[in-house]
Amino acid sequence: MRVVIAGGGTGGHLFPGIAVAEELKRREESADVVFIGTEHGIEALIIPREGYPIRYLRSEGVVGKSLMKKVRAGIQTVYSVFDSGTLLRQLRPDVVIGLGGYASFGPVLTAALMSVPTVVMEQNSVPGLANRILGRFADMVCLTYHESISFFAKHRTYITGNPVRQGIVTAKRESAYDLFGLERGKFTIFVFGGSLGAKKINGVVCGAFSYINDIREKIQFLHQTGKSDYDAVRETYRKWGFKGTVTAFVHQMGNAYAVADLVISRAGATTLAELTAVGRPAILIPYPYAAGNHQELNAQKLAEMGAARMILDHELDSETLAKNIRDLYESAETRHEMQRSSRSLGKPDAAQRVVDIVMSLLRKDRKAV
């Protein structure tokens, strides 16, 4: 069995695909899983580390771009369809799984036109442009949220939840302390702005130090900055004397969640799936320019259920963030309630559900032959 998993660009699209690949290999060790993505997406960094082969095509996103960049992206999309045809004829997959985003468009569309079984995964409550189009061609669509059903044909749509990698749920707190060089017994805050970092979150967290300086010796941070802010953020930690580990990118996300007493992050669907799978209290800061405002909608669900606190980007400042950090640091009871609510929302078996659908599609296709 050969499975092509197409997409990436950001961790939010890519990591659910890795979770599905893990489950496929768990069920059928001989399964051949190949990823397709772009050389400038996060998949070029992550997939080789995960041990899967990856093939590249030409593709760029069009949403939120200037007119000239949209024209360029449109041309690249045409190229991606031609590239996909070449790759799929070489790989001869039994099924193609699309993860959403621009890198999935060419492979899934081409597979559908070649009568190769296709599955599309949609992580957000408001589907992106690529999946809205691909949903018309795909054999099956796997959704995270019920609200997404209206965008797709109901008879081909399944609510599976958003797949989470096994390493997210199996990581242990004790080993995570050693991995990140953190002190046992200190209140640990994990900060990240998504797989690519977030300049505003980095700045506001650093600005909060002056408001929580009195508890400096009792807390520590694990802070993923992204490449561009790494040096400046690290220097700010040194200047204020706050303890912790500052890194451009965290590869061991499961360990990062395991060691955290509190998470401060954006509200991408994959981040929320991981948070709820492990039940971590969080302060969520939705990215304000996400398509369809889906991050705010995602975060609002958790906030309403008591699993997280939400601070909108336009309301975010260092003093507000510091107040929330202090409140949650001082109230173990509140954190425990948030943890319980978060776990109740998690779907740690989402990868199994998606693979069930993939396998049923393959069985149906084989019967038809």
PLM segments and residue spans:
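Nucleotide-activated sugar donor-binding and catalytic core shared by glycosyltransferases
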Residues: 1-369
